[in-house]
Amino acid sequence: MVTGATSLSLVRDELFATMEQAEQGLEQFIAERQNGSLLQHAVECLQQIRGTLNLIELAGAELLAQEALQLATDIPTGVSEERDGQLAALGNALYVLRRYLENVEANRQEIPELLLPAINEVRCAAGQPALPESFFFSARLDIPRPPSTAIDHLPSEAELGEESRRMRHMYQIGLLGLIREQNLYPSLKLMGRALARLDSLHGGVARSRLCWIGAAAIESIVDGQLLPRKSRKQLFSRIDRELKQLLIGPAYEAPRHLLKELLYLVALSDGQGPRSREVRELHGLAPLPFTDHLLEEESQRLSGPGQSVMRSLSTAIREELAGVKDMLDLIERGVAQPDSLTNLHAQLGKLSKTLGMVGLNSAGTALQTQLPTVAAWAASGVADSPPALLRLADAVLYVESMVGNLERGERRIIRPTPAEPGQEADAFAVHQLAEARIVVIEEAKAGLALAKRAITAYLESNGDKLNLANVPASLQAVRGGLWFLGQERAALLVGGCADYIQQRMIETAQMPSEQMLETLADALTSLEYYLEGGAVLRPQGQPDVLDLASASVKALGLPVAA
């Protein structure tokens, strides 16, 4: 038997009719809550819907129907307003299910992940835990990780504990930025570095598998510009709690469900970073048939008006446009009624507002810009400008071409509102000042990035000092810029890094250990994050990040000012 999207058409009419009966029964029960037969009829319809979806093997749709059925079964007759949330979740589940099946029928493609928000809404209403993003995803979790490169200096237990705690602190600072969605991608990069360093510190063994895959997942999020969903913030918050267990437990083993969620993010992004590629190739992760942003867009469409509603609205607007076109034809031929121009102005204004309300903002704006011209015609009683009349006709034709998007559920991005008139001078002055400060900050960030690249090249070349020739001067320039901006503490820390490179790497014959070079990179990364977070532009700053940088500089054996 043919199953899935291809077989939906065989049962479509009966399935959609049953869904309509379930929706009607639920709506009537909300109005007549003492009538248990109405709710029972909705439950029976849901049972039939679930059975049909099971028969044609639409797994995601069947799961949503199953969750809705369980919730409906638990709702008693005569419920009070305290159950309104559950009834609303049921209604939304049926609505989303119908929209999803419409899309499956139209596109012949199943994406059950689109239904997870509705499924979790029903589960939440029923007091059940949410399903993870990776629920419909599968991957092997028992594949051993490849051996990592051994570090040249094995830290003592005390050193390992201190470094690990510092890396967890770095992770927590980045996590706070992720949760608040402040300085988002630099925060993720800070978290990724912390996990990568923890993996290296603990020898790249099975115990640190969570750090290895977690660093790859964060690299994938940054590369793929994945959205900061609530579920992802919760995932990385759970990882922070796991890090605590990792640091105190020699036999620590990461929970398999966390590894699966992280692998899903790697597969979803299809990023090309070195860690992402290594993890993806080892686990055989194939690219997913959708992107994160596609899921977001399609989920929004599922919760929007249905196709039938949009078709009806499109038809109504087309009829309005046909009337406008007829009126323009009469005006052009000079046989219009005396009040035609006034009526035309009113009709265009109404259409402009309607188009804006349904998301066709460019079409609405096209008509809005014509209103002053038509208003002038109405006041004078004559359309005396053939070129202007032609421009209006072009605008109407453009709108007509855009209205077809309603039936496809397409949306347009709303443009930002322009600045208030009369405030241009003040806005320009503030803008110029901000631009000047931003230039200094960008130069400082570039200097720190140059230093990090130079240190990497120095390490890879086995201590070739030519790679460091310009670094101390570059960092001293960064120090001066920060001092100029009033960031004395950050300036002193950058100066400390410059002194370390000059005195311990350039002027001495012995190359520092890889561990010390990583600590130097930690300090520069923390300072870079401080700048990327815009702390220099905000009076309150980010003292925790400077504390982290200060701890790294102190670990280098340099004096640190309080």
Swiss-Prot record:
Interacts with PilG and FimV. It is found in: Cytoplasm. GO terms for cellular component: cytoplasm. SUPFAM superfamilies: Histidine-containing phosphotransfer domain, HPT domain (SSF47226). Disulfide bonds: none annotated. The keyword Nuclease does not apply. It comes from the Bacteria. One of its GO terms (biological process) is phosphorelay signal transduction system. Regulates multiple virulence functions including type IV pilus (T4P)-mediated assembly and twitching motility as well as cAMP-dependent virulence gene expression. Regulates intracellular cyclic AMP (cAMP) levels through the activation of adenylate cyclase CyaB. Also functions as a scaffold linking FimV and PilG at the pole, where type IV pilus (T4P), the Chp chemosensory system and the CyaB adenylate cyclase interact. Keywords: Cytoplasm. Disruption phenotype: Mutants show increased autolysis, reduced levels of surface-assembled type IV pili, twitching motility and diminished production of type III secreted effector. This is Scaffold protein FimL. The gene is fimL. InterPro entries: HPT_dom_sf.
